[in-house]
């Protein structure tokens, strides 16, 4: 009877020990992922800007308050080149860029491709711009965890998370090879960063 009780006690101890080890491993893995997301967000968010466009030719401040389109953009060079979506731009319109340091600057369109909905704009500023580290979209896999950074509803830069749901989406347009994600993307996020 005593021997049977010792065996049962040992089983309970082993099971509890396994549960504790599993929980520690799970918490450590979760913490590593959380830290990776935090580090990636902090690194990338300084490279994301807000894009305001208008056909208004008045001052920067009135242009900001009369903006027709609001979206996001990503700094891709320290010379002030920013990539965004071309649907945000108004033909012959003004472009205003809101930076993470609170500064505003004017931008000019360098080029755009409406078929792929991509535009490059340039701005000149007195402060150092931090370009994002550009990845290789051909290495993205379905199920990869990603972060979307942008300015939804013009409430300020935000980070949302999700996974890659699909790759190579073209929606009937042979120019496109879109990446689909389930990360929350709302009006104002257009042109923002999708990072992994």
Show which residues each predicted segment covers.
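N-terminal Lys/Arg-rich, disordered targeting/topogenic segments
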Residues: 1-9
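Hydrophobic membrane-insertion alpha-helices, especially the h-region
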Residues: 14-26
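Serine-dependent protease modules
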Residues: 26-196
């Amino acid at each position: 009877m005593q021997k049977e009780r010792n065996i049962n006690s040992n089983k309970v101890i082993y099971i509890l020990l396994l549960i504790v080890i599993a929980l520690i491993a799970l918490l450590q893995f979760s913490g590593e992922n959380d830290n990776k997301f935090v580090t990636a967000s902090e690194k990338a968010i300084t490279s994301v800007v807000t894009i305001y466009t208008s056909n208004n030719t008045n001052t920067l401040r009135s242009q900001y308050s009369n903006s027709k389109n609001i979206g996001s953009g990503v700094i891709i060079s320290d010379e002030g080149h920013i990539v965004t979506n071309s649907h945000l731009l108004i033909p012959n319109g003004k472009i205003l860029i809101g930076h993470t340091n609170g500064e505003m600057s004017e931008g000019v369109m360098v080029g755009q491709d409406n078929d792929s909905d991509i535009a490059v704009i340039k701005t000149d500023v007195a402060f150092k711009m931090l370009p994002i580290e550009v990845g290789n979209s051909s290495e993205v896999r379905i199920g990869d965890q990603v972060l979307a950074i942008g300015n939804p509803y013009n409430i300020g830069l935000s980070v949302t998370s999700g996974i890659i749901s699909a790759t190579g989406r073209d929606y009937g347009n042979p120019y496109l090879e879109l990446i689909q994600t389930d990360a929350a993307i709302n009006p104002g996020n257009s042109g923002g960063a999708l990072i992994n």
